Structures are given as structure tokens and as C-alpha cells.
Amino acid sequence: MKSESAAIDIPESSSVAKGKAPLIAVSRNEKGGYRKGIAIFDFILRLAAIATALAAAAAMGTSDETLPFFTQFFQFQASYDDLPTFQFFVIAIAIVGGYLVLSLPFSIVAIVRPHAVGPRLLLIILDAVALTLNTAAGAAAAAIVYLAHNGNSNTNWLAICQQYGDFCQKVSGAVVASFITVVIFVFLIVLSAFALRRH
């Protein structure tokens, strides 16, 4: 018995011969995965920023200390609402925390649709505004905390942290937490810029 093999030659198309079709498909998958990974990391950073912003606002808003001694006319007490700077801090950081909570759905949209430019562009603009507000509140409060710890001999402002230790610890912790939120916002903006970058 003779075994004959029949071979059929099919000519390659021009796109297969040049290798364009497989390269385009691979690059799209890599870009989508890359942007989706950025979007997931963005969502995690937003959750961390919510925690630090709300912790800063809560720590500052509950900072209150009354000294155990008093006179007939005076009771020695320190509270965040004694200083307008600390009041601004609580309001500004609460606004930033509220914005971060409201930005979570847009971050989820960026995960589901990693190629969508609109939500990412909106987030980068609003993140920059929130970063500015957060930095202003943190810097203003940091100046007052510095005076509370060290005073100012030129103006005869005395340091109060020797007497109001718990108060100073709370407001210092609130300022540190607000600057951690600032650092997270910087990472969020850089991530959004990478996600919007076109190859």
C-alpha cells in the first residue's frame, strides 16, 4: 500500500507576514493590565488616605485638656477651638476626607474601565485641589504646634506643652497624620499621571 501525503500550501497574509496583528494584541493586553494595576493601587491608596485624614480630623477635634488646678477666677483649659487655625484644620481635613470617600466610585470606574480617560482626568484635578487644601491646613497647624512646643522668646510667647502634654500630643499627631495624607495625595497624582500617559 502506498501512503501519499497531501500538503496544502496556504500563502501567508501580509499582516501575518509582517507580524503586526500579534504585536498589537499583546500591547493592548499589557497596557490594559498595567492601567488596571495602577487603578487598583489608586483605590488602595485612597482607602489609606481616608483613614489618615479622618484620624487627623478626629484627633484634632477631640484635643481638649483641663489642668487639675484652678483659681477662683480662672480654670486652665486648652482646646482646639481656642485657636482659629485649629478650627480651620478640622474643617479642611474633614472636607478632604469627605472628598476622598466621594472619589471612591470614580476610582472603581477606573478599575472596571482602565482605558477611560474622563474619570482619571477628573480625579487628578480634584486630587490637586484636595492636596492644596490639605497642605494649607497642615502647614498652618504645624506653625501653631511649633509655637506650642517651643514658644517664641522675641514675642514673649511661652511654650505650653510642658503644662498641656496630652493636648500637644493630640494636635501633633493630627498634624503628622495630615502630612501623611499629603504624601498619599502626591502618590495618587503621580499614579494618575502615569495612567493618563500615552505610549
Swiss-Prot record:
Ranges facing Cytoplasmic side: 1-37, 109-120, 195-199
Keyword match Cell membrane: yes
GO cellular component labels: Casparian strip; plasma membrane
Main location group: membrane
Key word rRNA-binding present: no
TM spans (from-to): 38-58, 88-108, 121-141, 174-194
Cell compartments where the protein resides: Cell membrane
Gene Ontology process terms (BP): cell wall modification; cell-cell junction assembly
Membrane topology reported for the UniProt record: Multi-pass membrane protein
Keywords attached to this entry: Cell membrane, Cell wall biogenesis/degradation, Membrane, Transmembrane, Transmembrane helix
Domain of life: Eukaryota
Side of membrane Extracellular, spans: 59-87, 142-173
Oligomeric and partner information: Homodimer and heterodimers.
UniProt function note: Regulates membrane-cell wall junctions and localized cell wall deposition. Required for establishment of the Casparian strip membrane domain (CSD) and the subsequent formation of Casparian strips, a cell wall modification of the root endodermis that determines an apoplastic barrier between the intraorganismal apoplasm and the extraorganismal apoplasm and prevents lateral diffusion.
Stated family: Belongs to the Casparian strip membrane proteins (CASP) family.
Protein name per its UniProtKB record: Casparian strip membrane protein 1
Organism listed in the record: Populus trichocarpa (Western balsam poplar)
